[in-house]
Amino acid sequence: RIGLVSTHMYKQFLDYQHATINTNEIFTRMIDNLQEVCEILKEAFSSRGVTTQNIYVDTDPQKSIVIINILWHKISFTTRCNFQPQALYRENGAHMFSGRIMAIRGNYNEIMAGVKDHDEEMVRLLDNEVASLFVPAESSQNSVLKIRHLANRELYLNQVDAPREFVLKVVETICGGGFYHEEGARKSFNI
């Protein structure tokens, strides 16, 4: 029986390695897409006479976090939630081992101030999550985009288009909404 367990764990390990490679490749392309979005927004706002000093992209040296600041909005993307093999639950039982790129509302570094372990990190990530892109080990298999405010409805994206589509969908979700004046309970809205 231990032989079966080791075979199962070895397959998980291989899937984890391949998913990590695919996830990192997509994340690197997302950084390029975010730079492009940033430049387009700078052009659009400067042509209207709006200062663009609050429109920028910042990455960490390990390329595991990228933050885009768009005027008063801050959006962070991270791969730091991939510290062990994990699968995306499937109703049919064919769970998909995958890497995950999380999009969160706010500045990752500010949100994680004082975090001491992975459990606490995940609680804060999930509390601020906007969407997640699940990247499978097999590069020919579609990635799965889940958007939190759409009841985690799943969108399937091929791994070529996934970086661009994920970036655009998250930017649209965050910047396409707005905030109400605070009056008791804090609320936001999406268009």
Which residue stretches match the model-derived regions?
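Residue-identity detector for glutamine
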Residues: 12, 17, 35, 53, ...
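Short, structured protein-protein interaction patches enriched in aromatics and acidic/basic residues
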Residues: 49-74
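Contiguous, amphipathic alpha-helical segments that mediate oligomerization or scaffolding
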Residues: 2-57
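Intrinsic disorder/low-complexity polar-acidic segments
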Residues: 66, 70-191
